[in-house]
Amino acid sequence: RNGTHKFPGFYSFSTVEHGKRREIDALPIRERAIHKCLCNNLLEEIYARSFIYDNGAGQAGKGMDFCLRRLKKHLRDHYRRYGLDGGIYQFDFASYFSSLPHDEIKRRARMKIMDDRLYALFCQIVDDFQNMRTADKEAERKRGVPLGSEIGQMVALDFATPIDHYIKDVRRIHGYGRYMDDGYVISHS
């Protein structure tokens, strides 16, 4: 109401997924409602415009099933054109969520969020990410977004979008897909 927002902190816990330990910084329900409102009413619309079709994470109507269907299509298309010639390259951006720099997140958001009050709220939320358990080293405190935040998910999706466009639009590689920080490239050379 008056342009101020007080962040209550994170609930931090660990989980093991596919044999990999993940540190989760989850938001309290009230804070999650603020993030959801900002995502649903602003960020999804302005960020999703720049996503490639073959990015399946965090978008309505997409997800893991969509990515699997696209991978199968890319494999069939490659086989029809090149047979067994070529290869599949998988990638996973190491420490992706914990390495995203806050200054760059805010710089990129400024180009998309025109309303000064909404941009200020967005920046305050990004600054609040410095309180995550996963950002416990002083040098790293201005890096990282939580896995448990919709805003963190949207920012993480956006951050690798220039790579997506380079591979799809500049290199013209049809067999490329990404789900958050994981992806593949199918190439004949």
At which residue positions do the language-model features occur?
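Reverse-transcriptase-like RNA-dependent polymerase core
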Residues: 2-20, 119-136
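Conserved pre-motif C helix in the palm subdomain of viral-like polymerases
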Residues: 21-52, 141-169
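Active-site-proximal segment of RNA-dependent polymerases
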Residues: 39-91, 95-98
